[in-house]
């Protein structure tokens, strides 16, 4: 039976949302086991049943203001560090946190470790496709690294391909390289060299360069980017979506009685748009290239988002995604 090590104290609404989400997932996936690291008293005040759940008492918490690497090294009894060591020592199969992103990435790299051959693990996020048909795409790297080399972007193309195949069940996923134009000759030295490396691998269904204005239209299944650019794109998408919904609400509320009546009539459609723009149903961001699944959900995650993130981790474990990664890179890198 697979076991997930959970940082129960990480996140804006921890441990409440974490425990509630884990319990919902436990009820849905009876073969999963959970190790909850954190303040046992606070956890038990929320927990309705400890079936398939083990609580490990810790005395420290890494908060959002802590410097990641220092916190990992100094707060040895923090819920995140203890959870990471549980994975490293083989007591758990995956690591999950809603807490400090940098600290989780540091724990993934320094404690869990990286797959042999992977020089820079990347952070993979799943985002919605905003077309009538719907769907989603993966963005990799979405913020684990500020600088990348062409070889690393090529590795991201491979990692994204295996993730899309194993977890999202997409056959022959389309891989695109984020650039400032679709023409092969456009881009920086980094993207030009990365383009050549990816295009040379016949095992990758490479659709070429893609522009940021098109990725929400579903032009590819996996978007490859350096971490700096990928993170900027991710935050621009999140910010635009949030701003658009606020603008729509403010416009309706300031339009007088007729505007409010119109808004009431449009409410079901507006809710559909909001739900389509939400990425919570796809789970968290995955540190691809680590020796085990290391998954980060948003700091403001509610119980529903925690549940979907556990579902995502369960899919990764059931499909044996890490073995496929490891076998490939051991043989080819």
UniProtKB/Swiss-Prot annotation:
Signal peptide: none
Subcellular location(s) per record: Cytoplasm
Full protein name: Phosphate acyltransferase
Leading EC class: transferase
HAMAP family: PlsX (MF_00019)
Family matches, as Gene3D superfamilies: Isopropylmalate Dehydrogenase (3.40.718.10)
Taxonomic placement: Bacteria, Bacillati, Bacillota, Bacilli, Lactobacillales
Alphabetically ordered keywords of this record: Cytoplasm, Lipid biosynthesis, Lipid metabolism, Phospholipid biosynthesis, Phospholipid metabolism, Transferase
Organism: Ligilactobacillus salivarius (strain UCC118)
Any one GO cellular component localisation term in the record: cytoplasm
Family indicated by similarity: Belongs to the PlsX family.
Catalytic activity: a fatty acyl-[ACP] + phosphate = an acyl phosphate + holo-[ACP]
SUPFAM superfamilies referenced in this protein's UniProt entry, alphabetically: Isocitrate/Isopropylmalate dehydrogenase-like (SSF53659)
Primary location class: cytoplasm
Keyword Lipid biosynthesis: yes
Function per UniProt: Catalyzes the reversible formation of acyl-phosphate (acyl-PO(4)) from acyl-[acyl-carrier-protein] (acyl-ACP). This enzyme utilizes acyl-ACP as fatty acyl donor, but not acyl-CoA.
GO biological process: fatty acid biosynthetic process; phospholipid biosynthetic process
Single GO MF descriptor: phosphate:acyl-[acyl carrier protein] acyltransferase activity
Subunit and partners: Homodimer. Probably interacts with PlsY.
């Amino acid at each position: 039976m697979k076991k997930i090590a959970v940082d129960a104290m990480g996140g804006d609404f921890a441990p409440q949302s974490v425990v509630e989400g884990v319990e919902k997932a436990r009820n849905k996936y009876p073969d999963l086991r959970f190790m909850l690291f954190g303040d046992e008293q606070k956890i038990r005040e929320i927990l309705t049943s400890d079936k398939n759940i083990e609580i490990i008492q810790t005395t420290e918490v890494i908060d959002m203001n802590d410097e990641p690497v220092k916190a990992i090294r100094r707060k040895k009894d923090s819920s995140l560090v203890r959870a990471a060591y549980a994975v490293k020592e083989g007591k758990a199969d995956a690591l999950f946190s809603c807490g400090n992103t940098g600290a989780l990435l540091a724990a993934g790299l320094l404690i869990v470790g990286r797959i042999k051959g992977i020089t820079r693990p990347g952070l993979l996020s799943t985002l919605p496709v905003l077309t009538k048909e719907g769907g989603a795409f993966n963005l990799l790297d979405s913020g684990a690294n500020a600088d990348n080399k062409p070889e690393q972007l090529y590795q991201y193309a491979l990692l994204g391909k295996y993730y899309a195949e194993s977890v999202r069940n997409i056959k022959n996923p389309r891989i695109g390289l984020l650039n400032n134009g679709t023409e092969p000759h456009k881009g920086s030295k980094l993207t030009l060299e990365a383009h050549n490396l990816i295009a040379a691998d016949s095992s990758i269904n490479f659709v070429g360069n893609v522009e940021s204005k098109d990725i929400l239209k579903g032009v590819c299944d996996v978007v490859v980017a350096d971490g700096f650019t990928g993170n900027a794109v991710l935050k621009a998408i999140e910010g635009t979506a949030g701003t658009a919904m606020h603008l729509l609400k403010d416009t309706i509320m300031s339009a007088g009685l007729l505007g409010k009546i119109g808004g009431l009539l449009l409410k079901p459609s507006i809710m559909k748009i909001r739900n389509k723009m939400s990425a919570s149903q796809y789970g968290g961001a995955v540190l691809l290239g680590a020796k085990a699944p290391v998954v980060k959900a948003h700091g403001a995650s509610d119980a529903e988002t925690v549940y979907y993130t556990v579902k995502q981790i369960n899919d990764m474990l059931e499909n044996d995604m890490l073995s496929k990664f490891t076998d490939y890179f051991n043989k080819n890198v």
